[in-house]
């Protein structure tokens, strides 16, 4: 993958294939597409849905990565029905993924509780988020160096392996290791799905395409929660994971075969040449891919982020709290390793992942900061939300899942509206001026309503408002990074965005874990009746123990009050962080996507 030279800070240096610049004749803060994009779009401006650009250029772009050439070759040879088939397959994958998310979201607290580790939910999330964030680097390079199909197949394999390991895990250590494979696999699949959506759509229609592939979540939000309850009642949580280890490979594999069939057809027609053997030996191949996939960068980022963030959750368990030697050592070591990652990318990496153009483009930076802040704020309070609904609101598993899935239902409808609004107006930044204030308002309201004895309808109302704002963020931040780069950098730009979100999620989980461990257990010790205080640690670590106390019993009321005390502080932290959005949203330039196109061939 040609990812660019090391960071250049020389005055006046700018690569010609980087992000577009504002034209001198353009209105203030309105982005004009580059000459290359305008030329590509000249025939595409007439599109009204599926658009055939193959007459513009009959061959894939030259001087781009192999993976980009492959997908352009596929779109140049396939028919309208092949395009429709891919969209349908991606819809089915999203449907299965939605069921997986909805079911396992409800089962995860019971899985960790079976190891008496319910309070370690955030620790597991921190480790998996850090690993996922780092591994977007090699995944982006795999889809650019090898191809989209090959990257998809690898991610399907990793996610299936993770599900099998989780279903068979007998202790927390195995479960945590499985969660890394599971999280990396499914995060990688979601990432490649976004890359594929960018490959087969025009910028003008990308919002509609994103809405279509996200629409299955409206179905799975309710059906999945009920299925999770049935797993717990009739079988066990392990079969919830095991079932998807069987289902998912069958649903996801056809995407790989459709892409490979299209590539074979392109090779037979001479549109792209088959890949020749490199002639490298096994050891030379290992060395080449070790640096091409930036494995040193992965190790530095994942290790540094994990070691730095874990102490914020583990400090209360340490013998001397924050004064413990290993807690201080972890924070210092993690920080130093993350600094080394930045220096490595800047000066020593043979093929650096972080491009200079990305780091100096205000739209890319703004979108990444929006995603990081949104994820940080969201994960400040979300990890224990499902448990809160069951323990404090006294909802059964299915109904708690319904409330927790509000985002999926709302986004399924709202994304279509946002997508059509962008197609009609050509602009998207104005939507941030609606989403940001609404999200902060709703999350602020939730501080008041996330307490015992509150009507559940108020919580659902806040969730709906939060979902409206969140849906806008999810779509616009992707669109913002894509309009700022050419097609050959789509995978890399999206990876930078996903890394930002992953780091934000890891930091949010660290904040959540720190607040939880420093508030919930002390609150239990204050609120529990004397007869139950000896059981405080068991209550703290096991959701099933919390639910075992009858509703309205002194013990249950004490647990509910402790939840309310902790949750209010989690939400306050998340709401305070969201204030940064008022700065980040002004960093995004006001692009007009009506006259922009990055793709070739038969696209939507």
UniProtKB/Swiss-Prot annotation:
Q: State the Gene3D superfamilies in the record.
A: MFS general substrate transporter like domains
Name the predominant localization: membrane
Indicate what this protein is called per its UniProt record. Answer: Siderophore iron transporter mirB
Any one GO CC term of the record: plasma membrane
**Residue segments, region Disordered:** 1-61
Q: How does it sit in the membrane?
A: Multi-pass membrane protein
Please state which protein family the record places this protein in.
Belongs to the major facilitator superfamily.
Q: What job does this protein perform?
A: Involved in the transport of siderophore triacestylfusarinine C and so has a role in iron homeostasis.
Q: Which residues cross the membrane?
A: 73-95, 115-137, 149-168, 178-200, 207-224, 237-259, 289-311, 326-343, 363-385, 400-422, 427-449, 454-476, 489-511, 566-588
Keywords of the record, alphabetical order, are: Ion transport, Iron, Iron transport, Membrane, Transmembrane, Transmembrane helix, Transport
**Example GO biological process term?**
transmembrane transport
Which subcellular locations apply to this protein? Membrane
Ranked from the top, the taxonomy reads:
Eukaryota, Fungi, Dikarya, Ascomycota, Pezizomycotina
Q: Which GO terms describe its molecular function?
A: transmembrane transporter activity
Q: Pfam families in the record, alphabetically?
A: MFS_1 (PF07690)
């Amino acid at each position: 993958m040609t990812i660019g030279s090391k960071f250049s800070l020389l005055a006046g240096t700018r690569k010609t294939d980087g992000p577009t610049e504002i034209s001198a004749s353009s209105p203030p803060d309105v982005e004009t597409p580059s000459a290359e994009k305008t030329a590509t779009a000249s025939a595409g401006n007439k599109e009204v849905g599926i658009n055939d650009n193959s007459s513009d250029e009959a061959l894939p772009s030259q001087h781009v990565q192999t993976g980009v050439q492959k997908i352009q070759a596929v779109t140049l040879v396939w028919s309208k029905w092949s395009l429709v088939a891919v969209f349908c397959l991606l819809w089915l994958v999203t449907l299965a993924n939605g069921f997986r998310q909805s079911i396992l979201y409800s089962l995860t607290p019971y899985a960790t509780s079976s190891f008496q580790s319910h309070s370690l939910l955030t620790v597991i999330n921190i480790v998996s988020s850090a690993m996922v964030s780092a591994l977007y680097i090699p995944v982006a390079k795999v889809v650019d160096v090898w191809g989209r199909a090959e990257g998809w197949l690898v991610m399907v394999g990793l996610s299936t392996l993770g599900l099998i390991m989780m279903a068979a895990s007998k202790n927390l250590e195995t479960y945590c290791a499985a969660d890394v494979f599971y999280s990396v696999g499914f995060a990688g699949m979601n990432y490649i799905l976004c890359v594929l959506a960018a490959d087969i759509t025009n910028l003008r229609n990308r919002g509609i395409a994103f809405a279509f592939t996200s629409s299955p979540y409206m179905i799975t939000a309710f059906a999945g929660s009920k299925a999770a309850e049935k797993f717990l009642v009739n079988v066990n949580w392990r079969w919830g994971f095991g079932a998807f280890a069987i289902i998912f490979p069958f649903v996801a594999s056809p995407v790989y075969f459709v892409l490979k069939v299209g590539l074979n057809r392109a090779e037979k027609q001479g549109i792209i040449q088959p890949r020749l053997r490199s002639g490298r030996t096994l050891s030379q191949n290992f060395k080449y891919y070790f640096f091409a996939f930036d494995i040193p960068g992965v190790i530095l980022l994942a290790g540094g982020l994990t070691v730095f963030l874990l102490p914020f959750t583990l400090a209360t368990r340490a013998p001397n709290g924050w004064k413990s030697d290993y807690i201080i050592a972890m924070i210092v070591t993690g920080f130093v390793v993350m600094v080394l990652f930045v220096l490595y990318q800047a000066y020593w990496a043979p093929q650096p992942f972080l491009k200079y153009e990305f780091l100096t483009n205000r739209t890319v930076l703004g979108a990444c900061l929006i995603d990081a802040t949104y994820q940080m704020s969201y994960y400040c309070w979300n990890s224990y939300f499902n448990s809160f609904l069951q323990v404090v609101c006294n909802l059964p598993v299915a109904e708690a899942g319904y409330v927790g899935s509000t985002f999926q239902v709302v986004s399924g409808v709202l994304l279509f509206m946002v997508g059509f609004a962008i197609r009609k107006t050509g602009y998207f930044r104005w939507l941030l001026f609606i989403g940001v204030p609404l999200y902060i308002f709703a999350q602020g309201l939730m501080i008041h309503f996330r307490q015992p004895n509150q009507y559940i309808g108020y919580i659902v109302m806040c969730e709906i408002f939060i979902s409206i704002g969140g849906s806008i963020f999810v779509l616009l931040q992707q669109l913002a990074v894509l309009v700022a780069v050419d097609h050959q950098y789509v995978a890399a730009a999206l990876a930078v965005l996903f890394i930002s979100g992953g780091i934000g999620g890891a930091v949010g989980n660290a904040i959540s874990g720190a607040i939880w461990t420093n508030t919930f257990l002390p609150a239990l010790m204050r609120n529990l009746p004397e007869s139950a205080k000896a059981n405080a640690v068991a209550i703290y670590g096991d959701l099933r123990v919390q639910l075992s106390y009858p509703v309205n019993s002194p013990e249950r009321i004490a647990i509910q009050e402790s939840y309310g005390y902790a949750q209010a502080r989690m939400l306050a932290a998340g709401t305070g962080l969201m204030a940064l959005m008022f700065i980040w949203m002004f960093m995004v330039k006001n692009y007009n996507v009506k006259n922009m196109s990055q793709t070739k061939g038969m696209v939507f």
